[in-house]
């Protein structure tokens, strides 16, 4: 599995640090970065062969991400103010992405059914954190999400 540094990244040092730690990708959150800083961090990450997963939540965030050069866009299903999750958010915002951008459904994915629903709509990339961490059997949970088993305990 690829290693994503999921943190509040806001400076160049953290990008270099991510490389040193062996990360394959970094999470850059549109809401906490000004547009120029976002663009600079994407460029730096790319130059260091790190994938930049740019997290968005609103239509305005999509515009900012596109202008900054985001190629991989994580659509956060979780409202970071209320912490409510809406799995429909990804599908609502998906048509607004540029054709060359890769969509990642992020937050609230808990079952193979959720995965299949997104795949039926053309989303094949997922950021799964909380459900995996809370699982008593993370390996079994991943197998279940991938359709290798119906039972998390296997």
Question: Model segments located where?
Answer:
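Glycine-enriched alpha-helix->loop->beta-strand junction motifs that scaffold or abut catalytic
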Residues: 1, 20-26, 46-50, 67-74, ...
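N-terminal active-site wall of soluble small-molecule enzyme domains
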Residues: 1-53, 61-64, 90-93
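Active-site-adjacent loop and "lid" segments of alpha/beta metabolic enzymes
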Residues: 4, 83-85, 91, 101-106, ...
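A cross-domain feature marking catalytic cores of carbohydrate-active enzymes
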Residues: 5-7, 30, 54-56, 77, ...
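Catalytic cores of alpha/beta
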Residues: 10-21, 57-68, 105, 109-128
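Glycine-rich phosphate-binding active-site loops on the catalytic face of alpha/beta enzymes
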Residues: 17-37, 74-83, 123-141
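Glycine/Thr-rich beta-alpha phosphate-binding loop at enzyme active sites
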Residues: 66-91
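C-terminal helical cap(s) of enzyme catalytic domains, especially alpha/beta-barrels
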Residues: 92-96, 119, 134-154
């Amino acid at each position: 599995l690829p290693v994503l540094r999921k943190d509040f990244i806001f400076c160049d040092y953290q990008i270099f640090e991510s490389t040193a730690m062996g990360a394959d990708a970094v999470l850059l959150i549109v809401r906490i970065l000004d547009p120029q800083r976002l663009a600079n961090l994407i460029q730096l990450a790319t130059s260091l062969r790190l994938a930049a997963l740019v997290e968005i939540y609103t239509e305005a965030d999509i515009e900012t991400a596109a202008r900054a050069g985001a190629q991989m866009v994580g659509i956060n299903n979780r409202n970071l103010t209320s912490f409510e999750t809406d799995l429909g958010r990804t599908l609502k915002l998906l048509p607004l992405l540029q054709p060359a951008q890769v969509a990642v459904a992020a937050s609230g994915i808990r079952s193979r059914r959720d995965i299949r629903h997104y795949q039926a709509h053309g989303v094949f990339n997922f950021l799964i954190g909380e459900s995996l961490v809370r699982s008593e059997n993370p390996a079994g949970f991943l197998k279940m999400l991938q359709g290798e088993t119906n039972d998390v305990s296997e």
